[in-house]
From Swiss-Prot:
Keywords of the record: Acyltransferase, Amino-acid biosynthesis, Arginine biosynthesis, Autocatalytic cleavage, Cytoplasm, Multifunctional enzyme, Transferase
Protein name: Arginine biosynthesis bifunctional protein ArgJ
Function: Catalyzes two activities which are involved in the cyclic version of arginine biosynthesis: the synthesis of N-acetylglutamate from glutamate and acetyl-CoA as the acetyl donor, and of ornithine by transacetylation between N(2)-acetylornithine and glutamate.
GO biological process per UniProt: L-arginine biosynthetic process; ornithine biosynthetic process
Active site residues according to the UniProt entry: 195 (nucleophile)
Length: 413
């Protein structure tokens, strides 16, 4: 957790409402950080449904394996998250650590270890010493309070400079239901996964298979469309918990992902996921600018996304944005290297509403002065039209500054 808050941090945070059936507690376990919370326990009433998506890394952490195993049953009672140590690439010791944590949390909550979910974030390759926090779990589980959402977001931070929270309240049938979410992430952020760490809870009575469908679809245009540094984490975990408590107030129980009554909920969940994903981008390590990259006119939507990610992940594009240099030639380079169908002589490029290149050459109306003024903004939009089809996609990233190098060069020291 940095002491210097990102200039792109939210100017204000939403008031996070209570989700019936969820209790939260945090503690200072001293796993890596001093004088700050680094342990989170989220406790759910019996009957809570759960769904999740995880990293696609071939080197997943021990907690990711633990969660994948437990997810099949679709029920959750406890979530335990630690920051400062990822418990990844830790072999047998890592598996033993998750087992011990799961057993301690289950004993504290009076449930089975199969209803416990774990997540860890921090340094890779160092064994996680569960003795630093396992004795704290009983107190956390019993002392949880329903209104500590921002405190929960703070406890899971690593190099983040601010806590990331989002909320939406919508109708399910004729009844209000609430969706709350927290997230962490600032570096080792790239798509093709879930997210860094993110946890969503709702009081809506939605079955686990439906939650899984909603989450898998919802991440495609949110968390799977953000990148800070093109590095996919070993620990990426996104879990959603549904306590079902709104059923007492008349909310209909949803067991079919095609249920028409899900429309508003699906859109609200999408807003929560997008808000959290963009907060991660805006807290990218050393970031000073958010960058939205849109590709249109590609052969397909998949092709458009690959080209957009090629642009968004290009160090040369990102450093040009950091230097407020409208170097559109680097966008041309990134399109060309993407390995997707493209036609040089049909390519057009915009920064904001300013067209810089058109049909394979610099736009005759190009103004260096106007473009330089645009590049001084905090939020930059880059668009590339490939000119060969109807495929389109949007991804988000941030600039690449010398602070990113400093943060990651000093991370373990």
């Amino acid at each position: 957790m940095s002491t210097t808050i990102s200039p792109l941090a939210p100017k204000k945070y939403p008031k996070m409402p209570v989700i019936e059936g969820v209790r939260i507690a945090t503690a200072e376990a001293g796993i890596k950080y001093k004088n700050r919370t680094d342990l989170l326990a989220m406790v759910f009433d019996a009957g809570t449904a759960v769904a999740g998506v995880f990293t696609k890394s071939k080197c997943p952490s021990a907690p990711v394996d633990f969660c994948r195993q437990n997810l099949a049953a679709g029920k959750a009672r406890v979530l335990v998250v630690n920051s400062g140590n990822a418990n990844a690439f830790t072999g047998k010791k890592g598996r033993e650590s998750t087992a011990l944590t799961g057993e301690a949390a289950a004993k504290a909550a009076g449930c089975t270890a199969g209803e416990v979910f774990l997540a860890s974030t921090g340094v890779i390759g160092e064994p996680l010493d569960t003795t630093k926090f396992s004795h704290l779990l009983a107190g956390l589980v019993s002392d949880g309070k329903p209104d500590l959402w921002t405190e929960a977001a703070k406890a899971i931070m690593t190099t983040d400079t601010y806590p990331k929270v989002a909320t939406q309240t919508v109708k399910l049938g004729d009844t209000d239901v609430t969706i709350n979410g927290i997230s962490k992430g600032a570096g080792m952020i790239a798509p093709d996964m879930a997210t860094m760490l993110s946890f969503i809870a709702t009081d809506a009575p939605i079955a686990a298979p439906v939650l899984q469908d909603l989450l898998s679809r919802g991440t495609a245009k949110t968390f799977n469309a953000v990148t800070v540094d093109s590095d996919t984490s070993t620990s990426d975990t996104l879990l959603i918990f549904a306590t079902g408590k709104a059923a007492k107030r008349g909310a209909p129980e949803i067991t079919d992902p095609k249920d028409a009554r899900l429309g508003q909920f699906r859109r609200a969940l999408g807003k929560v996921l997008k808000s959290l994903a963009l907060q991660v981008v805006r807290d990218g390590e050393g970031a000073r600018k958010q960058v939205e990259v849109t590709v249109t006119g590609a052969k397909s939507a998949r092709s458009a996304k690959r080209i957009a990610l090629s642009i968004a992940n290009s160090p040369l594009v990102k450093t040009a944005v950091a230097g407020e240099d409208a170097n559109w030639g680097r966008v041309v380079m990134a399109v060309g290297k993407a390995g997707e169908p493209a036609d040089r002589d049909r390519l057009s490029i915009w920064f904001g509403d300013i067209r810089l290149a058109h049909e394979g050459e610099r736009d005759p109306g190009y103004s260096e002065e106007a473009t330089s003024t645009y590049m001084k903004r905090d939020d930059i939009r880059i668009r590339a039209d490939i000119g060969i089809g109807r495929g389109k996609a949007t991804v988000w990233t941030c600039d690449l500054t010398k602070e990113y190098v400093a943060i990651n060069g000093d991370y373990r020291s």
